[in-house]
C-alpha cells in the first residue's frame, strides 16, 4: 500500500489555512475564507489611510496565485498573468460573491491535484513554477498553504484597522 501520510498532512493543513473554523464566538480565525466571512461589504474595497491594497485586491491576488501555481505545477503551464483566465476582474469592480466562488473553485482544483498524488514520493518530485524554476511538490504546496495564512492575517489586520476598534480581542473583552 502506498504511503500517503505526508500528502494527507499537507491536505489537512491546506484546508485549515483556507477554511479553518477558528473561534466561533468571536469570528477570529487564521484561515483565509473564515476571515473573509467577517469582512463587511463596506470594508471589501475600503483603504485605511496610507494603504494601497484593499481586501478585494488581496483576495484577487490569492486566487490568481492559486490558478497560476496549479497550472504550472499540475497543468499545461500555459497561463499568463494579466489574462482573464488568471485575473478575471480588475481591482475595484470584482463582484464579491463571484470572487468568493472563484476563489473556492481555484482552491478546490489545486487541492484536488494534491489529493490525486499517488504517494508521498511524489512530494519530492520537481514541478514547474510560474517563474521558471523547478521546485519539489512539497515546497509548492507549502508555499500555497503559507500564502493563504499570510494573506488571511493581512485581511484580518485591514478589517480591524477599518473597524471601530482594532485592539486585540482579549483586550476588547476586558482581559488585558
Predicted regions and their residues:
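Short, contiguous alpha-helical
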Residues: 1-36, 41-87, 128-176
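Acidic/histidine-rich alpha-helical segments that form the ligand environment
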Residues: 88-128, 135-147
Amino acid at each position: 500500500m502506498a504511503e500517503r501520510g505526508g500528502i494527507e498532512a499537507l491536505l489537512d493543513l491546506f484546508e485549515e489555512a483556507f477554511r479553518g473554523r477558528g473561534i466561533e464566538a468571536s469570528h477570529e480565525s487564521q484561515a483565509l475564507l473564515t476571515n473573509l466571512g467577517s469582512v463587511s461589504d463596506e470594508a471589501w474595497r475600503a483603504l485605511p489611510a496610507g494603504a494601497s491594497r484593499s481586501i478585494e485586491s488581496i483576495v484577487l491576488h490569492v486566487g490568481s496565485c492559486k490558478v497560476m501555481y496549479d497550472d504550472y505545477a499540475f497543468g499545461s503551464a500555459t497561463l499568463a498573468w494579466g489574462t482573464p483566465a488568471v485575473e478575471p476582474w480588475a481591482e475595484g469592480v470584482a463582484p464579491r460573491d463571484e470572487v468568493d466562488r472563484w476563489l473556492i473553485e481555484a482552491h478546490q482544483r489545486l487541492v484536488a491535484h494534491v489529493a490525486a498524488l499517488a504517494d508521498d514520493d511524489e512530494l519530492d518530485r520537481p514541478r514547474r513554477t510560474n517563474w521558471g524554476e523547478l521546485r519539489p511538490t512539497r515546497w509548492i504546496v507549502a508555499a500555497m498553504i503559507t500564502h493563504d495564512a499570510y494573506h488571511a492575517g493581512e485581511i484580518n489586520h485591514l478589517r480591524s484597522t477599518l473597524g471601530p476598534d482594532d485592539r486585540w480581542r482579549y483586550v476588547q473583552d476586558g482581559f488585558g
